[in-house]
A protein has these predicted regions:
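Structural signal for conserved beta-strand scaffold positions within catalytic alpha/beta enzyme cores
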Residues: 1, 57, 133-135
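Cell-envelope/extracellular polymer assembly enzymes that use nucleotide-activated donors
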Residues: 119
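Cys/His-dense Zn2+-coordinating finger/ribbon modules
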Residues: 32
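Glycine/small-residue-rich loop that forms an oxyanion/phosphate-binding "nest" at active or ligand-binding sites
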Residues: 35
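Acceptor/aglycone-binding surface of glycosyltransferases and processive sugar-polymer synthases
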Residues: 3-4, 8-21, 26, 38-114, ...
Length: 170
């Protein structure tokens, strides 16, 4: 428990630190709104073992084409920038369902302000991390309200793209 809300990065790093201290092999990230379904955890673990992956993303778009919508423009842009900078396609870079192996968990604990976001995944890929994806289905939001509105979504996508292109190289 934190005395104040430390946000996604602070909460994720606390969970990673706990996992390291208690000898866990991996950490899975779920959004707190109920979209992610637990039946996909084992297929993600199996993919990590089969592929020797460091990160496995629960993707909506491995076998299903991304819909054409304003919401998906940012996702397509991030996918393109990751392909340009890392040489690999991530079909669903903004998915909040990700599995990280022990080595990646240690990276998140070691680096200040290094959260489980597409720019951090791209940085780790450039450092040699292997990323795989597993097709998943996601439910509509089951609880809470999104903090994102149109302006915040545009701002998030712009910051993420700038970070992948410029900041994460250092």
């Amino acid at each position: 428990s934190h005395p104040v809300n430390l946000g996604l990065t602070g909460g994720f790093q606390t969970g990673c630190r706990y996992a390291l201290e208690h000898g866990y092999d991996a950490v899975i990230q779920f959004d707190a709104d109920g979209q992610h379904m637990p039946q996909y955890v084992m297929p993600m673990v199996e993919r990590m073992e089969q592929d020797g992956a460091d990160i496995v993303i629960g993707s909506r778009f491995v076998d299903v084409e991304k819909p054409v919508s304003a919401r998906m423009i940012g996702s397509r842009l991030i996918t393109s920038i990751i392909k340009l900078t890392c040489g690999k396609t991530i079909n669903d870079p903004t998915s909040g369902m990700r599995l990280f192996n022990h080595k990646m968990v240690a990276e998140f604990v070691r680096r200040f302000d290094f959260g489980p976001e597409p720019d951090s995944v791209a940085f780790l890929m450039r450092k040699g991390a292997k990323v795989s994806e597993v097709q998943v289905q996601m439910r509509e939001r089951q609880a809470g309200e999104s903090y994102l509105n149109a302006w915040k979504s545009i701002s998030y996508m712009a910051r993420t793209c700038m970070s992948i292109l410029f900041v994460q190289w250092f």
